[in-house]
Amino acid sequence: MNLLKKIIYWKLSLQFFLITNFRNKLYDLGLIKSHTFNIPVISVGNLAVGGTGKTPMIEFLIRKFSPNYNVGVLSRGYKRNSKGFILASDLDDAKSIGDEPFQYFTKFKNIKVAVDKKRKRGIKRLIKEGVELILLDDAFQHRRVKPEYSILLSDYENLYYEDYLMPRGKLRESKKGARRANCIVVTKCPEDISNVEKDRIKKLVKPKEYQQLYFSSIVYSDKIFSLNSSKNLIQLKDKKVNLVTGVVNPKGLLRHLKDLGLIVNHFNYPDHYNYLNSDVQNFADQIVITTEKDFTKLRNMDIENLFYLPIEFKIHNQEDLLAEIANRIAY
């Protein structure tokens, strides 16, 4: 980056800091009210733009709490072609409610999924639907709602304390915004992350005395699934496959397939990409492996051998986190 661009980015980042800091001060001083509700609300979000594992975290919480609560997930529905409040139904798709909400709706039939840019209104509508616990997707900066428990995520390979405000970096607000979180989860860690490395990160993150620091990993399945069949990836060793992704960071998925011996041709599209028939013609000639999120958009297109690779969100010391959340939301 040349000197002139650095100066421009620095000035823009300073302006961004002044705006976001002023807004946060208004909430901190109570000059703008944050609303609470008579049912527990759990917020999942991050300080940085881009993928930190919010979707796997939401799905983890759904699996853990839906057996005991009528769970509702509320998202703004990023890049949807609709407006206002929508309670997901069989008439909806990724275009009408957004990629992640449609994935939740498709996978979990025992919960309510809704989208609304105005979270306060969306929560009220979900309460009328009989929801007992609400999960807010990507809502750390949405201070109009004060959650019962706030989870802040940060990517292991791009931790927020090493980042800068936009546009110089990827932060949506100052690093000190992390103090609003009840816990911090470092995501996408190596499965075998050492205690020494955990201690190193803890010293740098410096969680407050009221905050717990957790570490999580993405575990990739050794099986791929279509609408009506599955395959063991080991069967595809030394075979050519087309990997199709429209996510922020597909490196882990690509590495997993190559480590298993697949010959991978990677078609990498922007996050939340809406696939065209002309795109499909480029990669439908081989077995196609994609993410769960992309599968929801590709499954109705003309692709004979389309499979998705599931992932599991593994939190180290997850029972401690679940006990902490359960204690906070027990009314």
Residue ranges and their predicted role:
Residues M1-P40:
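A transmembrane-helix-recognition feature enriched in membrane-embedded lipid enzymes
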Residues Q15, T55, Y104, D137, ...:
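Residue-level signal for inorganic ion chemistry
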Residues N24-D90, E191:
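Walker A (P-loop) phosphate-binding motif
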Residues V44, L74, S154, S216, ...:
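Hydrophobic residues at beta-strand termini and immediately following loops
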Residues R76-K79, D138-Q141, V248-P250, T291-K297:
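Short, polar loop motifs at secondary-structure junctions
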Residues R80-K208:
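Phosphate/Mg2+-binding loops and adjacent switch elements
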Residues L159-I289:
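C-terminal accessory "lid"/substrate-recognition subdomains
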Residues P270-N274, N305-Y331:
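Short, flexible loop segments at boundaries between secondary-structure elements
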